[in-house]
Amino acid sequence: MTTGLPSQRQVIELLGADFACAGYEIEDVVIDARARPPRIAVIADGDAPLDLDTIAALSRRASALLDGLDGANKIRGRYLLEVSSPGVERPLTSEKHFRRARGRKVELVLSDGSRLTGRVGEMRAGTVALVIREDRGWAVREIPLAEIVKAVVQVEFSPPAPAELELAQSSEMGLARGTEAGA
């Protein structure tokens, strides 16, 4: 049975170069042929945050490319196109995810079963610097990605402490380890 919709692979191949030119990559494509109208969701991510203007521009370009399909690939009927960022519910699973989450608060589950909450710092050679609360100040703990079982960005409703954010933005992994800064 044909759905009249392109496959996930076809959408990625069709849109990938345009998204890359804008500085974003397609993380996932979800096609729901059972929805009415059918839905094509394109999840994009990049080093720069995906703002509303960029989403609108990417959506317009994606729509034009998808509507321009012809022959056997032509989309039959109406469909709903969604272009969005991965959102906070997406687990961080690769170096690029941690690099893009720098400065964000995350909760980690480690391979030994322990949990840590901290702010993502520098990502280097398979190791992430995590700024954690220690006594009355902040410390940087280096954690190999291989030891992280699960990592999820936490939603924050108040700004971080300046010293915490400064450590997370520091580009010298290891220099700040064990140092204390005022809360």
From Swiss-Prot:
Keyword Cytoplasm: yes
Superkingdom of origin: Bacteria
GO annotations of cellular component type: cytosol; plasma membrane
Keyword terms, alphabetized: Cytoplasm, Ribosome biogenesis
SUPFAM superfamilies membership: YhbC-like, C-terminal domain, YhbC-like, N-terminal domain
UniProt-annotated location(s): Cytoplasm
GO BP, one annotated term: ribosomal small subunit assembly
InterPro entries: Ribosome_maturation_RimP, RimP_C, RimP_C_sf, RimP_N, RimP_N_sf
Main location: cytoplasm
Pfam families: DUF150_C, RimP_N
Family: Belongs to the RimP family.
Function text: Required for maturation of 30S ribosomal subunits.
Other facts noted in the record for this chain: Was identified as a high-confidence drug target.
NCBIfam families associated with the record: PRK00092.2-2
Protein name listed in UniProt: Ribosome maturation factor RimP
Gene name of the record: rimP
